[in-house]
Protein backbone atom coordinates (compact mmCIF):
# COMPACT_ATOMS: atom_id res chain seq x y z
CA UNK A 1 0.00 0.00 0.00
CA UNK A 2 2.77 2.44 0.95
CA UNK A 3 4.62 1.66 -2.30
CA UNK A 4 1.61 1.64 -4.63
CA UNK A 5 -0.07 4.85 -3.50
CA UNK A 6 2.82 7.28 -4.31
CA UNK A 7 3.15 5.64 -7.72
CA UNK A 8 -0.54 6.20 -8.41
CA UNK A 9 -0.33 9.84 -7.36
CA UNK A 10 2.74 10.43 -9.55
CA UNK A 11 0.93 8.87 -12.50
CA UNK A 12 -2.10 11.04 -11.81
CA UNK A 13 -0.12 14.27 -11.62
CA UNK A 14 1.89 13.36 -14.70
CA UNK A 15 -1.26 13.84 -16.76
CA UNK A 16 -1.16 17.62 -16.26
CA UNK A 17 -0.05 19.42 -19.39
CA UNK A 18 2.58 22.13 -19.49
CA UNK A 19 1.55 25.73 -20.03
CA UNK A 20 4.13 26.28 -22.75
CA UNK A 21 2.97 25.08 -26.17
CA UNK A 22 4.94 25.24 -29.44
CA UNK A 23 1.67 25.59 -31.33
CA UNK A 24 -1.97 24.63 -30.69
CA UNK A 25 -2.38 22.17 -33.55
CA UNK A 26 1.02 20.52 -33.17
CA UNK A 27 0.68 20.23 -29.39
CA UNK A 28 -2.83 18.78 -29.54
CA UNK A 29 -1.81 16.22 -32.11
CA UNK A 30 1.25 15.25 -30.10
CA UNK A 31 -0.77 14.86 -26.90
CA UNK A 32 -3.47 12.78 -28.55
CA UNK A 33 -0.81 10.48 -30.02
CA UNK A 34 -0.01 9.38 -26.44
CA UNK A 35 -3.67 8.59 -25.67
CA UNK A 36 -3.92 4.98 -24.49
CA UNK A 37 -7.16 3.70 -26.00
CA UNK A 38 -7.35 0.27 -24.42
CA UNK A 39 -10.88 0.51 -22.98
CA UNK A 40 -14.00 0.50 -25.21
CA UNK A 41 -14.98 4.02 -24.11
CA UNK A 42 -11.48 5.30 -24.93
CA UNK A 43 -11.65 3.76 -28.40
CA UNK A 44 -15.09 5.31 -28.99
CA UNK A 45 -13.79 8.72 -27.90
CA UNK A 46 -10.84 8.27 -30.26
CA UNK A 47 -13.25 7.88 -33.18
CA UNK A 48 -15.08 11.06 -32.13
CA UNK A 49 -11.75 12.90 -31.87
CA UNK A 50 -10.50 11.75 -35.28
CA UNK A 51 -13.74 12.77 -36.96
CA UNK A 52 -13.54 16.18 -35.30
CA UNK A 53 -9.99 16.69 -36.58
CA UNK A 54 -11.18 15.87 -40.08
CA UNK A 55 -14.01 18.41 -39.74
CA UNK A 56 -11.54 21.04 -38.59
CA UNK A 57 -9.61 20.79 -41.85
CA UNK A 58 -12.64 22.55 -43.42
CA UNK A 59 -11.87 20.97 -46.77
CA UNK A 60 -14.29 21.28 -49.67
CA UNK A 61 -15.91 17.98 -48.74
CA UNK A 62 -16.29 19.15 -45.13
CA UNK A 63 -17.81 22.43 -46.31
CA UNK A 64 -20.34 20.55 -48.42
CA UNK A 65 -21.32 18.22 -45.60
CA UNK A 66 -21.54 21.11 -43.13
CA UNK A 67 -24.23 22.69 -45.31
CA UNK A 68 -26.34 19.60 -44.64
CA UNK A 69 -27.00 17.89 -41.32
CA UNK A 70 -24.59 15.04 -42.07
CA UNK A 71 -21.74 16.28 -39.87
CA UNK A 72 -23.87 16.94 -36.80
CA UNK A 73 -25.65 13.60 -37.22
CA UNK A 74 -22.32 11.77 -37.43
CA UNK A 75 -21.01 13.58 -34.35
CA UNK A 76 -24.22 12.76 -32.48
CA UNK A 77 -23.83 9.05 -33.24
CA UNK A 78 -20.17 9.06 -32.17
CA UNK A 79 -21.01 11.00 -29.01
CA UNK A 80 -23.80 8.56 -28.09
CA UNK A 81 -21.45 5.59 -28.59
CA UNK A 82 -18.82 7.20 -26.38
CA UNK A 83 -21.19 8.03 -23.53
CA UNK A 84 -22.73 4.55 -23.70
CA UNK A 85 -19.30 2.96 -23.23
CA UNK A 86 -18.42 5.42 -20.44
CA UNK A 87 -21.59 4.50 -18.54
CA UNK A 88 -20.85 0.78 -18.99
CA UNK A 89 -17.31 1.24 -17.64
CA UNK A 90 -18.60 3.25 -14.67
CA UNK A 91 -21.25 0.61 -13.87
CA UNK A 92 -18.66 -2.17 -14.00
CA UNK A 93 -16.37 -0.32 -11.60
CA UNK A 94 -19.25 0.34 -9.18
CA UNK A 95 -20.05 -3.39 -9.17
CA UNK A 96 -16.43 -4.14 -8.27
CA UNK A 97 -16.75 -1.85 -5.25
CA UNK A 98 -19.15 -4.50 -3.84
CA UNK A 99 -18.16 -4.91 -0.17
CA UNK A 100 -17.20 -1.29 0.57
CA UNK A 101 -19.38 0.97 2.68
CA UNK A 102 -22.34 2.66 1.00
CA UNK A 103 -20.99 6.11 1.86
CA UNK A 104 -17.69 5.35 0.14
CA UNK A 105 -19.43 3.87 -2.88
CA UNK A 106 -21.63 6.98 -3.15
CA UNK A 107 -18.59 9.29 -3.10
CA UNK A 108 -16.85 7.35 -5.85
CA UNK A 109 -20.02 7.29 -7.96
CA UNK A 110 -20.46 11.05 -7.52
CA UNK A 111 -16.88 11.78 -8.60
CA UNK A 112 -17.17 9.62 -11.71
CA UNK A 113 -20.60 11.02 -12.56
CA UNK A 114 -19.21 14.57 -12.49
CA UNK A 115 -16.25 13.64 -14.73
CA UNK A 116 -18.60 11.83 -17.11
CA UNK A 117 -20.90 14.88 -17.27
CA UNK A 118 -17.99 17.20 -18.12
CA UNK A 119 -16.91 14.97 -20.98
CA UNK A 120 -20.47 14.79 -22.33
CA UNK A 121 -20.86 18.58 -22.09
CA UNK A 122 -17.65 19.08 -24.09
CA UNK A 123 -18.87 16.89 -26.95
CA UNK A 124 -22.30 18.53 -26.83
CA UNK A 125 -20.71 21.97 -27.17
CA UNK A 126 -18.70 20.82 -30.19
CA UNK A 127 -21.86 19.61 -31.89
CA UNK A 128 -23.78 22.81 -31.05
CA UNK A 129 -20.96 25.00 -32.34
CA UNK A 130 -20.91 23.17 -35.67
CA UNK A 131 -24.69 23.44 -35.92
CA UNK A 132 -24.35 27.18 -35.33
CA UNK A 133 -21.66 27.40 -38.00
CA UNK A 134 -23.95 25.59 -40.41
CA UNK A 135 -26.62 28.25 -39.93
CA UNK A 136 -24.10 31.06 -40.36
CA UNK A 137 -22.69 29.40 -43.47
CA UNK A 138 -26.09 29.03 -45.07
CA UNK A 139 -26.80 32.72 -44.41
CA UNK A 140 -23.61 33.75 -46.23
CA UNK A 141 -24.02 31.73 -49.42
CA UNK A 142 -22.21 33.56 -52.22
CA UNK A 143 -20.13 35.66 -49.80
CA UNK A 144 -16.62 35.24 -48.45
CA UNK A 145 -16.56 32.92 -45.46
CA UNK A 146 -12.84 33.17 -44.69
CA UNK A 147 -13.36 35.10 -41.44
CA UNK A 148 -16.16 32.74 -40.44
CA UNK A 149 -13.93 29.71 -40.96
CA UNK A 150 -11.14 31.34 -38.95
CA UNK A 151 -13.40 31.92 -35.96
CA UNK A 152 -14.70 28.35 -36.15
CA UNK A 153 -11.17 26.94 -36.35
CA UNK A 154 -10.04 28.90 -33.28
CA UNK A 155 -13.12 27.87 -31.33
CA UNK A 156 -12.71 24.20 -32.24
CA UNK A 157 -9.08 24.28 -31.06
CA UNK A 158 -10.23 25.45 -27.64
CA UNK A 159 -12.98 22.85 -27.52
CA UNK A 160 -10.59 20.09 -28.50
CA UNK A 161 -8.16 21.14 -25.77
CA UNK A 162 -10.95 21.09 -23.18
CA UNK A 163 -12.21 17.75 -24.46
CA UNK A 164 -8.74 16.22 -24.17
CA UNK A 165 -8.28 17.60 -20.65
CA UNK A 166 -11.60 16.22 -19.40
CA UNK A 167 -11.04 12.88 -21.16
CA UNK A 168 -7.68 12.49 -19.42
CA UNK A 169 -9.26 13.46 -16.11
CA UNK A 170 -11.89 10.73 -16.45
CA UNK A 171 -9.28 8.22 -17.61
CA UNK A 172 -7.05 8.96 -14.60
CA UNK A 173 -9.92 8.70 -12.14
CA UNK A 174 -11.00 5.34 -13.51
CA UNK A 175 -7.41 4.06 -13.54
CA UNK A 176 -6.76 5.11 -9.93
CA UNK A 177 -10.00 3.60 -8.62
CA UNK A 178 -9.42 0.35 -10.54
CA UNK A 179 -5.86 0.13 -9.23
CA UNK A 180 -7.18 0.70 -5.72
CA UNK A 181 -9.69 -2.13 -6.13
CA UNK A 182 -6.98 -4.52 -7.37
CA UNK A 183 -4.59 -3.55 -4.57
CA UNK A 184 -7.32 -3.95 -1.96
CA UNK A 185 -8.30 -7.37 -3.30
CA UNK A 186 -4.70 -8.62 -3.30
CA UNK A 187 -4.13 -7.32 0.22
CA UNK A 188 -7.33 -8.99 1.43
CA UNK A 189 -6.32 -12.35 -0.04
CA UNK A 190 -2.90 -12.16 1.62
CA UNK A 191 -4.49 -11.24 4.95
CA UNK A 192 -6.92 -14.15 4.71
CA UNK A 193 -4.07 -16.54 3.97
CA UNK A 194 -2.13 -15.29 6.98
CA UNK A 195 -5.11 -15.81 9.29
CA UNK A 196 -6.42 -19.06 7.84
CA UNK A 197 -3.04 -20.77 7.49
CA UNK A 198 -2.54 -21.43 11.24
CA UNK A 199 -6.20 -22.39 11.63
CA UNK A 200 -5.93 -24.95 8.82
CA UNK A 201 -2.82 -26.45 10.41
CA UNK A 202 -4.58 -26.62 13.77
CA UNK A 203 -7.58 -28.34 12.18
CA UNK A 204 -5.32 -30.93 10.54
CA UNK A 205 -3.57 -31.57 13.85
CA UNK A 206 -6.90 -31.92 15.63
CA UNK A 207 -8.10 -34.44 13.06
CA UNK A 208 -4.94 -36.50 13.52
CA UNK A 209 -5.23 -36.50 17.29
CA UNK A 210 -8.86 -37.60 17.18
CA UNK A 211 -8.67 -40.25 14.46
CA UNK A 212 -5.47 -41.95 15.62
CA UNK A 213 -6.82 -43.16 19.01
CA UNK A 214 -9.97 -44.46 17.34
CA UNK A 215 -7.99 -46.41 14.79
CA UNK A 216 -5.63 -47.87 17.40
CA UNK A 217 -8.51 -48.94 19.63
CA UNK A 218 -10.39 -50.56 16.76
CA UNK A 219 -7.30 -52.53 15.73
CA UNK A 220 -6.70 -53.68 19.30
CA UNK A 221 -10.31 -54.80 19.66
CA UNK A 222 -10.14 -56.70 16.34
CA UNK A 223 -7.01 -58.53 17.47
CA UNK A 224 -8.57 -59.49 20.78
CA UNK A 225 -11.71 -60.74 19.06
CA UNK A 226 -9.73 -62.74 16.52
CA UNK A 227 -7.64 -64.38 19.26
CA UNK A 228 -10.66 -65.38 21.27
CA UNK A 229 -12.43 -66.87 18.26
CA UNK A 230 -9.36 -68.89 17.37
CA UNK A 231 -9.05 -70.23 20.89
CA UNK A 232 -12.69 -71.17 20.88
CA UNK A 233 -12.32 -73.16 17.64
CA UNK A 234 -14.91 -70.91 15.97
CA UNK A 235 -17.77 -71.73 18.33
CA UNK A 236 -19.16 -68.27 17.70
CA UNK A 237 -22.56 -68.97 19.21
CA UNK A 238 -21.16 -69.61 22.69
CA UNK A 239 -19.40 -66.26 22.75
CA UNK A 240 -22.04 -64.20 20.99
CA UNK A 241 -23.04 -62.34 24.13
CA UNK A 242 -19.44 -61.46 24.88
CA UNK A 243 -18.90 -60.19 21.32
CA UNK A 244 -22.01 -58.04 21.58
CA UNK A 245 -20.76 -56.52 24.80
CA UNK A 246 -17.44 -55.69 23.19
CA UNK A 247 -19.17 -54.17 20.16
CA UNK A 248 -21.28 -52.01 22.44
CA UNK A 249 -18.17 -50.97 24.32
CA UNK A 250 -16.44 -49.89 21.11
CA UNK A 251 -19.59 -48.11 19.92
CA UNK A 252 -19.83 -46.17 23.16
CA UNK A 253 -16.20 -45.13 22.88
CA UNK A 254 -16.68 -44.07 19.25
CA UNK A 255 -19.71 -42.00 20.20
CA UNK A 256 -17.73 -40.38 22.98
CA UNK A 257 -14.93 -39.49 20.57
CA UNK A 258 -17.46 -38.16 18.03
CA UNK A 259 -18.99 -35.92 20.68
CA UNK A 260 -15.55 -34.56 21.53
CA UNK A 261 -14.91 -33.87 17.84
CA UNK A 262 -18.23 -32.02 17.60
CA UNK A 263 -17.40 -29.84 20.59
CA UNK A 264 -13.95 -29.08 19.20
CA UNK A 265 -15.46 -28.23 15.80
CA UNK A 266 -17.91 -25.80 17.40
CA UNK A 267 -15.06 -24.13 19.25
CA UNK A 268 -13.10 -23.95 16.00
CA UNK A 269 -16.08 -22.38 14.23
CA UNK A 270 -16.39 -19.71 16.92
CA UNK A 271 -12.71 -18.94 16.67
CA UNK A 272 -12.90 -18.70 12.88
CA UNK A 273 -15.78 -16.22 13.16
CA UNK A 274 -13.80 -14.10 15.62
CA UNK A 275 -10.99 -13.91 13.03
CA UNK A 276 -13.24 -12.87 10.14
CA UNK A 277 -15.35 -10.14 11.75
CA UNK A 278 -12.46 -7.75 12.54
CA UNK A 279 -10.89 -8.60 9.18
CA UNK A 280 -13.98 -7.47 7.25
CA UNK A 281 -14.20 -4.28 9.30
CA UNK A 282 -10.53 -3.57 8.65
CA UNK A 283 -10.99 -4.10 4.89
CA UNK A 284 -13.89 -1.63 4.81
CA UNK A 285 -11.95 0.96 6.78
CA UNK A 286 -8.81 0.62 4.63
CA UNK A 287 -10.83 0.91 1.43
CA UNK A 288 -12.56 4.07 2.70
CA UNK A 289 -9.15 5.57 3.51
CA UNK A 290 -7.87 4.64 0.04
CA UNK A 291 -10.81 6.32 -1.69
CA UNK A 292 -10.37 9.44 0.45
CA UNK A 293 -6.70 9.68 -0.58
CA UNK A 294 -7.63 9.22 -4.24
CA UNK A 295 -10.15 12.05 -4.06
CA UNK A 296 -7.67 14.36 -2.34
CA UNK A 297 -5.07 13.62 -5.03
CA UNK A 298 -7.58 14.23 -7.81
CA UNK A 299 -8.64 17.56 -6.31
CA UNK A 300 -4.99 18.63 -6.29
CA UNK A 301 -4.75 18.28 -10.10
CA UNK A 302 -4.91 21.73 -11.83
CA UNK A 303 -8.24 22.09 -13.66
CA UNK A 304 -7.72 25.42 -15.44
CA UNK A 305 -7.22 25.34 -19.21
CA UNK A 306 -3.91 26.89 -20.39
CA UNK A 307 -4.43 30.01 -22.48
CA UNK A 308 -4.48 29.58 -26.24
CA UNK A 309 -1.66 31.16 -28.21
CA UNK A 310 -2.97 33.13 -31.13
UniProtKB/Swiss-Prot annotation:
Stretches the record annotates as 8 X 22 AA approximate tandem repeats: 77-248
GO cellular component terms, A-Z: chylomicron; extracellular exosome; high-density lipoprotein particle; low-density lipoprotein particle; multivesicular body, internal vesicle; very-low-density lipoprotein particle
Annotated signal sequence range: 1-18
GO MF terms held by the record: cholesterol transfer activity; heparin binding; phosphatidylcholine-sterol O-acyltransferase activator activity; phospholipid binding
Primary subcellular site in the record, as a coarse category: secreted
SUPFAM superfamilies to which the protein is assigned, alphabetical: Apolipoprotein A-I (SSF58113)
Residues in Sequence repeats: 77-98, 99-120, 121-142, 143-164, 165-186, 187-208, 209-226, 227-248
Maturation and modification: APOE exists as multiple glycosylated and sialylated glycoforms within cells and in plasma. The extent of glycosylation and sialylation are tissue and context specific. Glycated in plasma VLDL.
Keywords: Chylomicron, Endosome, Extracellular matrix, Glycoprotein, HDL, Heparin-binding, Lipid transport, Lipid-binding, Oxidation, Phosphoprotein, Repeat, Secreted, Signal, Transport, VLDL
Domain of life: Eukaryota
Annotated compartments: Secreted; Secreted, Extracellular space; Secreted, Extracellular space, Extracellular matrix; Extracellular vesicle
Task performed by this protein: APOE is an apolipoprotein, a protein associating with lipid particles, that mainly functions in lipoprotein-mediated lipid transport between organs via the plasma and interstitial fluids. APOE is a core component of plasma lipoproteins and is involved in their production, conversion and clearance. Apolipoproteins are amphipathic molecules that interact both with lipids of the lipoprotein particle core and the aqueous environment of the plasma.
Subunit annotation: Homotetramer. May interact with ABCA1; functionally associated with ABCA1 in the biogenesis of HDLs. May interact with APP/A4 amyloid-beta peptide; the interaction is extremely stable in vitro but its physiological significance is unclear. May interact with MAPT. May interact with MAP2. In the cerebrospinal fluid, interacts with secreted SORL1. Interacts with PMEL; this allows the loading of PMEL luminal fragment on ILVs to induce fibril nucleation.
Protein name: Apolipoprotein E
Source species of the chain: Dicerorhinus sumatrensis sumatrensis
